[in-house]
A protein has these predicted regions:
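Structured, helix-rich domain cores that form ligand/interaction pockets
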Residues: 5, 9-441, 450-515
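N-terminal secretory signal peptides that target proteins for export/translocation
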Residues: 1-3
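Residues in the recognition helix of alpha-helical DNA-binding motifs
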Residues: 447
Length: 515
């Protein structure tokens, strides 16, 4: 018995000795105190965020917009927009306004949509109004409006719709056109969630086919290979885009990074505690690189800045230096080290139901007496007031995921816990409590850093193409680049600056960016 306790004591003392000797090479992020852990890694589990992400609506007039119309008001309207189209052909967007719209930033361009919508009135990052001055049939809508994602998420759907309708009403009043009907054209219902942190397992085809109850006959999966023989299921779709309803499930975090737009989503997820401060750091830095494959490198960058173990910080810096100088690195080794030192990035999935007019026109909506005061736009208000009922229909009759163990008849099975949480998500159409300026400043700073990186790379490339391979200082390269420009280049630059400045929202860029 004494020998037994002696052996245990020996093992215990050896463990203490090894901890003292090698403990400094442990995962030091894991050894931080609870307060530090909460600061960097706290997030709410299994959280959902719902909103209408895309909203198209169409407007038709009582007036005759056919090619051989005799309506004088339509002829005046057509003449004015034909003049704008001829002027805009020099590739410079034009300021545009009508009485009552002086407080709105509006620009005209002759962008084409669907063949015959050849005029576009835009409010940067808010909406685009596509106008057909000639329609092929008398049942074709003369105007199609696209409401952008940013105001829909940050200001609310009704507020964004009413803001765009100010322009429609101003056009109607100024040109004496009578609005006949305003109706929905396409609406996307989206659920952002951090519920699934291993979507490639949960949504694996053999699991999905057992869980799904739907009218879809086909499904499309897209995978991407990852380091260390792992793979990533980043896109699933059911149906076709031209169908009444098209369903997508994909990695929203990856889309934001690779597409290089909508960086304000990162802020939105952070303020709703769907991602941690660590995730916020990684996504913000990764956005500037616009390359998803550098995810593990940014995780190492985080540790090199905030980790406490000098041995591992040096290893992190070595990998980053190797990538910066050689352009290549062993991503398998990088991935293993990142997994050892820091948590994996929180994945945000987007579950999206894209509905089109061919399906929504048959919906039996509850008509609200209070919406009669809105006149020709009553259909839109009724549709938005039926939002909960429509989303319940989409997430049950169009597609639902069920627990096959809950009933012998699959059609009677209860929802999976994941699907229950999705259907319980709150649907509140109000402006967000987080000041919009925070989102604007955050997005602008990320885009500024992205543009600066591109500018530096382009400036060096221009110098090498112009002067050949040289050892000049970078400052000299920049000076020489300016000397290469002629009058035509300066004129083209001024035209582009004018055009680009009109494409940006003036509220987002009214002041100099603060460092």
């Amino acid at each position: 018995m004494a020998k037994k306790y002696s052996s245990v004591l020996t093992i215990f003392l050896c463990a203490i000795f090894l901890t003292c000797v090698f403990g400094h090479r442990g995962i030091s992020m894991a050894s931080q105190n609870t307060e530090q852990k909460n600061n960097w890694f706290f997030r709410k589990e299994k959280k959902f965020l719902h909103n209408i992400d895309t909203f198209y609506y169409s407007v038709s007039f009582c007036n005759d917009f056919l090619k051989d119309t005799e309506d004088e008001n339509v002829k005046t309207f057509r003449k004015d927009f034909d003049k704008l189209a001829a002027t805009e052909s020099i590739d410079i967007n034009l300021d545009w306004s009508l009485p009552g719209l002086e407080d709105m930033q509006l620009i005209y361009s002759n962008r084409s949509f669907a063949g015959y919508y050849n005029n576009c009135i835009s409010c940067p990052e808010r909406f685009d109004i596509f106008i057909a001055t000639r329609t092929p049939t008398d049942i074709t809508s003369e105007i199609l409006v696209q409401l952008r994602s940013k105001p829909l998420w940050l200001q609310g759907v009704v507020s964004t719709f009413e803001y765009s309708m100010r322009v429609i009403n101003a056009i109607s009043k100024y040109y004496h056109l009578q609005i006949h009907e305003v109706k929905e054209n396409r609406i996307d219902y989206c659920w952002h969630t951090n519920y699934l942190q291993s979507p490639e397992k949960y949504l694996r085809i053999d699991n999905f086919v057992q869980m799904q109850v739907s009218r879809f006959k086909r499904i499309n999966y897209q995978y991407q290979f990852k380091p260390n023989n792992e793979y990533e299921n980043d896109y699933i779709s059911l149906g076709r885009r031209s169908d009444k309803c098209f369903v997508r499930m994909y990695l929203k975090t990856k889309e934001v990074i690779e597409q290089g737009y909508k960086p304000w989503f990162i802020n939105e997820w952070f303020y709703n505690q769907m991602i941690s401060r660590f995730d916020y750091y990684v996504l913000s830095n990764l956005y500037e690189l616009r390359n998803w494959k550098y995810l593990d490198i940014i995780r190492l960058q985080f540790y090199s800045e905030y980790g406490s173990d000098e041995f591992y910080r040096t290893k992190c810096n070595d990998y980053m230096h190797e990538l910066a100088t050689k352009g290549v690195v062993n991503f398998d080794s990088v991935n293993k080290l990142a997994d050892k030192l820091v948590p994996r990035l929180t994945v945000i999935m987007n579950i999206e139901f894209r509905t089109t007019r061919k399906g929504t026109k048959s919906y039996c909506l509850i008509e609200y007496e209070r919406n009669k005061k809105y006149g020709v736009t009553k259909r839109i208000y009724d549709y938005l007031d039926n939002r909960r009922m429509i989303s319940d229909y989409l997430t049950h009759d169009t597609l639902r995921l069920v627990d096959i163990n809950s009933d012998s008849n699959k059609s009677r099975c209860d929802y999976t816990n994941f699907w229950k949480s999705l259907r319980r998500t709150k649907q509140i159409d109000v402006a967000k409590c987080v000041p919009e300026k925070l989102h604007r400043d955050y997005s602008r700073k990320l885009d500024y850093n992205l543009m600066k990186r591109r500018y530096i790379h382009s400036a060096i490339s221009l110098s090498l193409y112009g002067k050949g391979i040289n050892n000049d200082e970078v400052e000299q390269d920049l000076i020489d680049n300016l000397a290469m420009l002629n009058d035509n280049d300066i004129h083209a630059a001024m035209n582009y600056k004018y055009k680009r400045s009109h494409q940006l929202n003036s509220e987002d860029f009214e002041n100099k960016l603060e460092d």
